[in-house]
Amino acid sequence: MAVGLRRSDSIADMMPEALRQSRYQMKRCFQRYVSQGKRLMKRQQLLDELDKSVDDKADKDQLLQGFLGYVISSTQEAAVLPPFVAFAVRMNPGIWEFVKVHSANLSVEQMTPSDYLKNKEALVDDKWGAYDDDSQLEVDFGALDLSTPHLTLPSSIGKGAHLVSRFMSSKLTDNKKPLLDYLLALSHRGDKLMINDILDTVDKLQTALLLAEVYVAGLHPDTNYSEFEQKFQEWGLEKGWGDTAETCKETLSSLSEVLQAPDPINMEKFFSTVPCVFTVVIFSIHGYFGQEKVLGMPDTGGQVVYILDQVRALEDELLQRIKQQGLNATPKILVLTRLIPEAKGTKCNVELEPIENTKHSNILRVPFKTEDGKVLPQWVSRFDIYPYLERYAQDSSVKILEILEGKPDLVIGNYTDGNLVASLLTSKLGVTQGTIAHALEKTKYEDSDIKWRELDHKYHFSCQFTADMIAMNTSDFIIASTYQEIAGSKEKPGQYESHYAFTMPGLCRYATGINVFDPKFNIAAPGADQSVYFPFTQKQKRLTDLHPQIEELLYSKEDNNEHIGHLADRSKPIIFSMARLDKIKNITGLVEWYGQNKRLRDLVNLVIVGGLLDPSQSKDREEIEEINKMHSLINKYQLVGQIRWIKGQTDRVRNGELYRCIADTKGAFVQPALYEAFGLTVIEAMNCGLPTFATNQGGPAEIIVDEVSGFHINPLNGKEASDKIADFFQKCKEDLIYWSKMSTAGLQRIYECYTWQIYATKVLNMASIYGFWRTLDKEERQAKQHYLHMFYNLQFRKLAKNVPTLGEQPAQPTESAEPNRIIPRPKERQVCPFLRNLLKKETGNN
């Protein structure tokens, strides 16, 4: 597209002249838009109608390459209410403008997000979208963030901690007392940390820092803190500066720089050393959370693996930090999940379970309870979980305070349910909260906001989207795995961005839900467990005892319920893919690319790991379709002898060695998904040294630098993708070191950007920075917290009560399922007049 806009440009100002210049063609186009009555049109429909409206190819090309083509190509959707067409134009990630065009006279009017949403509502509910009805429930969280600094450039989205550091530096330039107060409040189990009450002014603190820095500079760098601890205390300095003279000197110098001339770099450096996080609580409530025999159970998958790896990394980082801070403290991490008495052979009925390969981390399971206090024995779908969450938060709070012997320093939620409970807990205890979505259901189901009534009986999206909004806006910081998760790409909004302005007609209109330019957004990409996924070249670590099993999986010639097909020519490299069998993962697409590309078939074999092999064994409609399609493609392209299809595998350890065995063949990993939010299998494959081809739609496009550390493929162009894979293997035949070069480059990319150690460092730095930010932003936060508390009490509670609960059966008495002490429900607050008017129709309050 030849035309672009600066952010200062307004589409509403520029569009009238553009319409005037192409008046004849655009009147025809807009007549086509409104000819079918009211409807919601997507970008491609708009472009198709434009194409049909202009007969002359030269005129059509000129239009598409001009300003109007830019606007329509940038439109995500348009609400057609004859004679008007309202456009939602996304000029860049996070940057939207709403305009309305009259189809007869082509007049243009700028719209607020709220006005656009009213038009959209009228498509499904005339009464709800009525312009003269101001009593409809409209929520505008952005109105409470006007004093909060925001990022301004799309390229800066996801770098919130950097902006917060800059803003804190600016505030401390004028007044350093808040930092002094923060340091004076630091303690652990009753012991003061870093400074004591002697240093009750900034001048005294700066003097003490100067004295201490000069003193430790004269010591041997390795001198233990205990040898000068008494001297520090005389100056008002307590433990926590470091374990040696050298580390103390660095921390003292960093704080001195912050106090003398605050700047973001020194601010971040200093807060990365502050001893403020010792205990962490992580909520992951739904499904069967455990360490064995749970993968493949309902609602149980990658989130469990993510959290267990996350915990190990966080504990390692905490132990290292505590040692470097010179403290004799023990970190504690609790993963809060649901205790399920009917555990189906898992350990989900065990209350407290140590996490393997950790020293101080445990899974704590707390049961769901009915209104009369009975333990709910059976599993509950993540879509039906909402009536139990408030009571769960209350019961969890009691257990957490008991086991940790105090408040946690950091609470992290996962998915909608975990994030909501984390919000309830942190609001009550006044501690720092981080949020991880994993998946936002609103983006999985097209138009699920305006069609929520059709889906609510099955998915209860009214509860889910409300809970998501509460958690996003309560949280101090939000952790995303990729930029695209937050703000998408040039063409497609991100998962969070789709919650900027949306409506659920008859329920609630979000004039501003969440703004991706909010500084709470940060990117911390997970890694793969490097004890499981390590390079194939590390021969001494290879799991050779698994090789007979893997040999059978890959090369045996018999078909059974574990694998079908065989590889006739074992000398050829293997291209390998492993994923669920559903349409979005596009495994059948890869098989079709392979079947259609003779050159690729001559160069390599294909191995697929995913799904079931027999459609009669699956209960998932989409998987059944994909299984049947796989069989059809194998027959259609006569792939027997060139393909091996292996049933989905859940043994991570064996899967790690399987990646390495594929690397032994000088093969490659292919991830062909139509869209992939992150791409953990891409990380796993690259960790094992496999050159990797991955979709350019989603997270893998950020993980891989194209043709440097791997290859991007377009899942919508199978010929181009398969040719790119074939070109690689052809080049490997001609250049004997090319395969090793790409393998090494992939590993280098992982070590620089995608390890759990890097992740843990980022998350704990966020906890420290946003923990201080809470104290600086306290007054501004308070108004929003009152708003959110009201919204929870008056909206979410009502919705949760409408979700049917399971038949209540008495649980078998077990020690771990004993009823906990019940915290009384908080009374509903009085609503201020401003909010009372906002909610009067929904709540009946006057």
Curated annotation (Swiss-Prot):
Q: Which UniProt keywords apply?
A: Glycosyltransferase, Transferase
Q: What is a single molecular function from GO for this protein?
A: sucrose synthase activity
Q: Which reaction does it catalyse?
A: an NDP-alpha-D-glucose + D-fructose = a ribonucleoside 5'-diphosphate + sucrose + H(+)
Region of interest called GT-B glycosyltransferase, as start-end residue ranges on this chain: 276-755
Q: Does this UniProt record's set of keywords contain Glycosyltransferase? A: yes
Q: Top EC class per UniProt?
A: transferase
Q: Which Pfam families match?
A: Glycos_transf_1 (PF00534), GT-B_Sucrose_synth (PF00862), SUS_EPBD (PF24862), SUS_N (PF24861)
Query: What are the recorded Gene Ontology BP terms?
Result: sucrose metabolic process
What EC number(s) has UniProt assigned to this enzyme? Answer: 2.4.1.13
**Taxonomy, superkingdom:** Eukaryota
Job description of the protein = Sucrose-cleaving enzyme that provides UDP-glucose and fructose for various metabolic pathways.
The record ties this protein, via NCBIfam families, to:
sucr_synth
**Entry's PANTHER family?**
PTHR45839, SUCROSE SYNTHASE 6 (PTHR45839:SF16)
Q: Which family, according to UniProt?
A: Belongs to the glycosyltransferase 1 family. Plant sucrose synthase subfamily.
Query: This chain belongs to which protein, by name?
Result: Sucrose synthase 6
Q: Could you tell me which species this protein originates from?
A: Oryza sativa subsp. japonica (Rice)
